[in-house]
Amino acid sequence: LSAQAQTAFFTEDFETDGLNTRYTAPEGSGSDGDQDYFDRISNDTSDRTHTNVQGTFYWGAQDIDDGAAAGVKPASLLITGIDITGRSSLQFSAYFAEQRPEASGEDDIDSGDFAIVEYQIDNGGYQSLIAFEGGGGNNTPFFEDTDFDGTGDGTQLETAFAQFTKSIAGTGDSLDLR
């Protein structure tokens, strides 16, 4: 993921382990090595078959309330203190994908599952930036939630990572993402 004005000035690609140095996972992180994870992972098992991966590693989440993963739901990843002093027209850009379908052939996003990125400038309170939700009900795919109403109504996530770019309103000295 990156924050940028005209050119990228901050990038976190997860290629090296930055847990507790470049980013934190306050509720915890971990993996059972296969299907339950909230961690920096790669396509190292038959369960993860993503394409268009930007490098080798990425931050992934699957069945995060399992004890082998974060053990709680929701779980968060924080990147704080990004220096934005003197920058304007900020943008957030990141690649997102969904691991699907599961072995049964069904999608595995259930009612209440979501992924959301929020930002705050100078500790001014978090604002929604981009969200993904199920399409309603259980065993649905993830869709972008374009109006933040809790229902996916936009672009459907696929197993191929796709880039999403959003504008960040405001200016200041320090940007936090979660």
Predicted regions and their residues:
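Extracellular glycan-recognition surfaces and repeat-rich motifs
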Residues: Q6-D66, K73, N138
